[in-house]
UniProtKB/Swiss-Prot annotation:
GO cellular component, one term: plasma membrane
Chaperone recorded as keyword: no
Membrane association type: Multi-pass membrane protein
PROSITE patterns the UniProt entry points to: VWFA
Sequence intervals crossing the membrane: 8-28, 63-83, 171-191, 317-337
Entry protein name: Uncharacterized protein BB_0173
PANTHER family membership: LEUCINE ZIPPER PROTEIN 4 (PTHR22550:SF5), SPORE GERMINATION PROTEIN (PTHR22550)
SMART domains in UniProt: VWA
Subcellular location: Cell membrane
Keywords: Cell membrane, Membrane, Transmembrane, Transmembrane helix
Keyword field contains Transmembrane: yes
InterPro entries xref list: UPF0353/GerABKA_families, vWA_BatA_type, VWF_A, vWFA_dom_sf
Species in which this protein is naturally found: Borreliella burgdorferi (strain ATCC 35210 / DSM 4680 / CIP 102532 / B31)
């Protein structure tokens, strides 16, 4: 994936000429605001129609006089900018290196309702860390697979973070039944990485390690991942303790109770080790965040950026603008004000 960022900048080849601009406030003050100067100057004026004999008040005369000469001052200032040699620089930053393709496999079985992380259940805390994880990997395509008794692709690999987060928020425990088919979830993730052309392809599994309804053996998963050169990183969430369980179903029904599991991460360890990934055992907030951060470091791609700069001189445009301003000045001074220079 190539990202293109364009930046436009206005630069000057001879910037010292810009110091001439400081004299214009002095000229304007001397001609129009200094006592007994421009504010008191009399000049002939005539109006069209039946108003030729109408005598305007001094302040209206002075206002029209200043308004007319403002075009002359603007024209002169634009000429100074033209002398300074203005140019537009278009800087293009092209990311040549492609991002990684990552599929997150998320357990949404009932045991993920165990409350042990900052008063949140395992699923809600996992969602929170996933959001932080994807926000740090701007150039990566990231997908999401959820599994329980069944498994399903929730988000195809994409760079659309808003869409990803929306679908992530819409996941509920037991959406896919009461069970834990880890092998099926990983197999679906692998099928979506099969035709990926990314330099790095990996899967991140977040589960409490309880597998009780799987139709796909771990050896099948390992062989498929090895054949596709996909690394599988596993984050085992849990321990062999009793936890309170709190979660809400999509229907709005709320479950609350206790849960004791037999935590056995051996399957996760074997899958990760044989596919070139790593296994992380998580039992508190700190270790959970460390696992995500460590994965980000190991699967980080070195970014190659090409910078192309295109300069275009625009002094001619400034001269045209100055000419137009002078033309307006002469129209006002010669036709509307009937001033004789």
């Amino acid at each position: 994936m190539k990202n293109l960022i364009e930046v436009l900048m206005l630069t000057f080849n001879e910037p010292l000429y810009l110091f001439l601009l400081v004299i214009f406030p002095l000229i304007i003050y001397f001609n129009h605001f200094l006592k007994n100067r421009g504010g008191k100057i009399k000049f002939p004026i005539s109006l069209y129609g039946n108003f030729n004999s109408l005598k305007l008040k001094d302040y209206r005369l002075n206002l029209m006089y200043f308004f007319t000469y403002s075009f002359l001052y603007l024209a002169a200032m634009v000429m100074v900018f033209a002398l300074a040699g203005p140019s537009v620089s278009k800087k293009k930053m092209i990311h040549l290196s492609a991002g990684a393709d990552i599929v997150i496999v998320l357990d949404i079985s009932p045991s993920m309702g165990a409350v042990e992380f900052s008063s949140k259940n395992r699923l809600e805390f996992s969602k929170e860390l996933i959001r932080g994880f994807i926000s740090q990997r701007e150039n990566d395509n990231i997908g999401l697979v959820a599994f329980a008794k069944d498994a399903s692709i929730v988000v195809p690999i994409t760079t659309d973070r808003e869409f990803f987060n929306k679908k992530l928020d819409d996941i509920y425990i037991m959406d896919l039944g009461n069970g834990s088919a880890l092998g099926l979830g990983i197999s679906i993730a692998l099928s979506h990485l099969k035709h990926s052309e990314a330099l790095k392809r990996s899967i991140v599994v977040l589960t409490d390690g309880v597998v009780n309804s799987d139709e796909i053996x771990k050896d099948q998963v390992i062989n498929l991942a090895q054949g596709l050169n996909v690394k599988i990183y596993s984050i085992g969430i849990g321990s062999s303790e009793e936890f309170s369980v709190e979660f809400k179903l999509r229907s709005g029904k709320f479950y609350q109770g206790s849960f004791k599991e037999v935590y056995d991460p051996s399957m996760l360890v074997e899958i990760s080790n044989k596919t070139g990934g790593l296994f992380y055992s998580v039992n508190d907030d700190f270790s959970f965040q460390f696992a995500i951060q460590d994965f980000s470091k190991k699967e980080n791609l070195e970014r190659k950026i090409k910078i192309a700069v295109d300069n275009k001189d625009i002094y001619k445009e400034f001269l045209v603008l100055a000419f137009c301003l002078l033309l307006v000045y002469f129209i006002f001074s010669k036709i509307f004000l009937k001033e004789i220079l």
